[in-house]
């Protein structure tokens, strides 16, 4: 599991849910 992909997923989730 790549940390970069994890970071990208976190950004997407943050943008969608507004929970950062």
Swiss-Prot record:
Top-level lineage group: Eukaryota
Keywords in alphabetical order: Amphibian defense peptide, Antibiotic, Antimicrobial, Cytolysis, Disulfide bond, Fungicide, Hemolysis, Secreted
Localization, UniProt: Secreted
Tissues where the protein occurs: Expressed by the skin glands.
Pfam families in the cross-refs: Antimicrobial_1
Keyword Repeat: no
One GO term (biological process): defense response to bacterium
Cellular component terms per the entry's GO annotation: extracellular region
Family annotation (InterPro entries): Antimicrobial_frog_1
Cystine pairings recorded for this chain: 14-20
Functional description taken from the UniProt entry: Antimicrobial peptide with activity against Gram-negative and Gram-positive bacteria (MIC=50 uM against E.coli, MIC=6 uM against S.aureus) and fungi (MIC=13 uM against C.albicans). Shows hemolytic activity on human erythrocytes (HC(50)=25 uM).
Family: Belongs to the frog skin active peptide (FSAP) family. Brevinin subfamily.
The protein's name in its UniProt record: Brevinin-1SPb
């Amino acid at each position: 599991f790549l940390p970069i992909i994890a970071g990208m997923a976190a950004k997407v989730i943050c943008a969608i849910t507004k929970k950062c």
